[in-house]
Amino acid sequence: MSELAFAPEVVAASRDPLVRVIVGPNDDPQGAVSAVRVAATPARVWEIIRDVEAYPSRIHMIERCHVEGDRLTMRLAFRIALFTARFGYTARLAIDEGRSLEVRYESGEPRDLRLRFDVVPAPAGDATLLYVASGYDITTLGWLVKLFLKHHPEIRYGVYPGSSLALLDSIRRAAESPG
């Protein structure tokens, strides 16, 4: 998850976010990488990414977040019709200050969670390129997801890009907003 999925020049020139599905050895989706040009300085984008405990106020699927040293405890909440499905996990944070933040799964659900945020100055120096990579074991998201996957396995091709794009857009919006 550490190499950039798109050349910086391609991201900088694109008007819209870019996304790529990550497939496993059996051509099954396992995650996605997305990238976008952010109209904010790298320092501002990094400030938003680095403030992990503020994620619940910025990212709708995150209900609670606590960081102690390099250990992260997070609770996710997904509202589905009349009920809410909640999941929690612990992970380690790997930080390359000002450049990348990676969440490395330790325990809980969704299993095998991998998140990575990369901040790259735009080639023209007028913006920031934000890359978000995400992946997890989709089968650990409860009985409802298993039921949907049993009858519609093709939705895996949308769930992973949707997760990555939701994270990307939340960080972009926060970085571009005043304050």
Which role fits each region the language model picked out?
Residues Y105-V159:
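Beta-strand/loop substructures that line and gate deep hydrophobic ligand-binding cavities in soluble
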Residues V33-V36, I62-C65, F87-A94, R114-P121, ...:
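Hydrophobic/aromatic beta-strand elements that line small-molecule binding cavities or substrate pockets
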Residues A39-A43, V67-D70, R92-R99, D118-L129:
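A short, structured loop/turn motif at beta-sheet edges
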Residues P25-D28, E53-R111, G162-G179:
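Glycine-rich portal/gate segments that line the openings of hydrophobic small-molecule binding cavities
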Residues M1-G69:
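Hydrophobic ligand-binding cavity/cleft-lining segments
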Residues A35, V45, A91, Y131, ...:
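Short, flexible active-site loop motifs that bind/organize anionic cofactors or intermediates
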Residues V36-A40, E154, G158-G162:
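Soluble non-cytosolic domains of exported or imported proteins
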